[in-house]
Amino acid sequence: MVSGSIALNIYGIPRMTRDIDIVIELSENRIDEFINLFPNSYFDKNVIKNEIKRQGMFNIIDHSTGFKIDFMIRKDSEYFTFAFQRRSRIKELDTELWVINLDDLIIAKIIWIQQSQSEKQMSDIENLLLNPEKNIDYIKTWCSKLNLQTFNLLDNE
C-alpha cells in the first residue's frame, strides 16, 4: 500500500520526492518470494527478518538514480490492520496501485507528529483536511482511540 509523499500527490498535495513509502504485509516464510520480485536489488534477509519481528522498515536504493523505496511492515494492531484493509486500488499513470485511504493518511500524519511537530507535516494535515472526501468522524474516532494529540488541527472540523 503506497503511503507518504506519493499518496499526498495522489490526494492533490504536490510534493517532490526521491522515495516511495510502501506498507506491506510480509511473513518470514515469504521473504524469498518477496526478494524475487526485485531481481536487480540486494536485500539482507536477516535485516528483513528482524524488521518483520519488530514491525519496522527496510529499504532498497537504485544506485544509478538514488531513488529509494522504504518498505514498512504493517503493524499488528487493530487500527493498522483496519487501515490496511481500507486501502484503495487506483490507476495512476497506467499503473494500478493500492494506496492508503485519505482518512488513514491524515491519521498517519497525526501519528507522525506525535514525535516532532514539523511545519511540513502540520501543513500536510491542514491541506488534507481541506479535502471534502474526508470522513472527519472516522478520523476523530481513531485519534481518540489511539490517544493521539491532535494539536488543535481538528478543532474546526
Annotate each predicted stretch with a short phrase:
Residues 1-157:
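Compositionally biased terminal segments of proteins
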